Amino acid sequence: MPKTRKQRSRRPRNQRPSTPWPISQVSDRAFSTGTLSTFSATVYRPIGAPFLGGFVPLGYTAMPCWPRAPNIRLPGTPSMDALSAQLYNTLSLGSPPSPPKELPAPSRFSPPQPLLRPPRFLHPSSTPLKNTPPSETIASSSPWESSCQPCPSPTLGSGPKTSTPYGAAPSCVSTSISSPPP
């Protein structure tokens, strides 16, 4: 039985298979038969800032840890070691943490003290007296004047104490609005 030869492909030897990357990118790399040298030529790149002569390696690429920060604290402040020791002493695991100190709750029986006196509302039809100069009229109608009559305190009255609902006008303001001019 005669031996038959396998036909070879008609492709010439110097033609390479097409690569997915551009040829210009491949042309400047050095290829060799060993895979280790190929990977070392393509993977490892110099790290640093480029300049005219080549690459200058930056300092932090080879350092295992960051350098210590310069001591810039003010002379009166404690160091971080002292602060951390103080914090560790106050937050020791042996004693249970104390609850945070809260402000004492306001009593239900004491009325809240107003920070400012409410202004007096005058009826629009009320006109100042004719014999007073305008400077005194302006000064006496000022809501911050000490001559304003304050609202009657509910604790001084003999009647039962009632609270004003939120949004409703206090009794002194509503009476001064609804009162007819003298």
UniProtKB/Swiss-Prot annotation:
**Cell compartment(s), UniProt:** Host nucleus, Host nucleolus; Host cytoplasm
Q: Which GO terms describe its molecular function?
A: RNA binding
What's any one GO cellular component for it? host cell cytoplasm
Region described as Homomultimerization: spans on this chain: 57-71, 124-132
Q: What is its main location?
A: host cell
**Keywords for this protein:** Host cytoplasm, Host nucleus, mRNA transport, RNA-binding, Transport
**Is RNA-binding one of the keywords?**
yes
Report the domain of life of the source organism: Viruses
User: Position of motif Nuclear export signal?
Assistant: 83-94
User: A biological process (GO) annotation for this entry?
Assistant: mRNA transport
State where composition is biased (Basic residues). 1-14
Show the segment(s) annotated as Disordered. Answer: 1-26, 90-182
Q: Where is the composition biased (Polar residues)?
A: 127-150, 172-182
Positions of short motif Nuclear localization signal, and RNA-binding (RxRE): 2-19
Tell me which family the UniProt entry assigns to this protein.
Answer: Belongs to the deltaretrovirus Rex protein family.
Q: How does it assemble?
A: Homomultimer.
Domain remarks: The RNA-binding motif binds to the RxRE, a complex secondary structure consisting of four stem loops and a long stretch of stem structure, present in incompletely spliced viral pre-mRNAs. This region also contains the NLS which mediates nuclear localization. These overlapping functions prevent Rex bound to RxRE from undesirable return to the nucleus. When Rex binds the RxRE, the NLS becomes masked while the NES remains accessible.
Tell me the protein's name. Answer: Protein Rex
Q: Which organism is it from?
A: Human T-cell leukemia virus 3 (strain Pyl43) (HTLV-3)
